[in-house]
Amino acid sequence: AEGVLPADGPDRMIEEYREHLDKGELLYNPVLAGYKHPKTIDWTPFLTKGYIENCDTTVPIKELKRLSKRLTTFPEGFVLHSRVKKIAEDRAAMGEGKVPVDWGMAENLAYASLLVSGYGVRISGEDVGRGTFFHRHAAFHDQDRENWAEGTYHPLMNLQEKQSSFYSYDSVLSEEAVLAFEYGYASANPYELVIWEAQFGDFANGAQVVIDQFIASGEAKW
């Protein structure tokens, strides 16, 4: 009715298709079996050990204290929110051994130990910079900043002159898209810890297809 194809168009297409079949001609572009793209990541070295095998992840106390100092040091003139300032002060005391280390500080120290050892860290999710329950604080905001786009400081990006990259992305409420992207990113970066964090437990439901189709069966299926 719209004139997209002439009246005899479909019949002619079928006839031509059958003529090609009768001649034994290939009607599709062949896919090369066993082809390996030059930029394909070789995961073979990482498949020799089981994930339940013991691994020494200890960090010397001297190094933990050094990293703690870096995690609680801010640029001159950087003004913290009063509640966040208290958290930073408590973390400094934790690094000095004056009070027990809490979950948020332990997490930041773990990331820091990876970053100075040559392993990148990348976190994404709706509220990962602060942490949904106010625990992480990987990103700090200057209360005297002139505009929203400026005045953000990430201690994990400033541990030492030579370190691996740290990124934290407060992503939009599109769990499936974000997790799918991060899965692809992680697949191409074996030396980087890539984390997607659902803001609340049921938010993972929006990304369930990616979990089922790619992550749960990743090694066996893909």
Where are the model-predicted features located?
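Flexible, glycine-rich loop/tail regions that form catalytic "lids" or insertion modules at the edges
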Residues: A1-W222
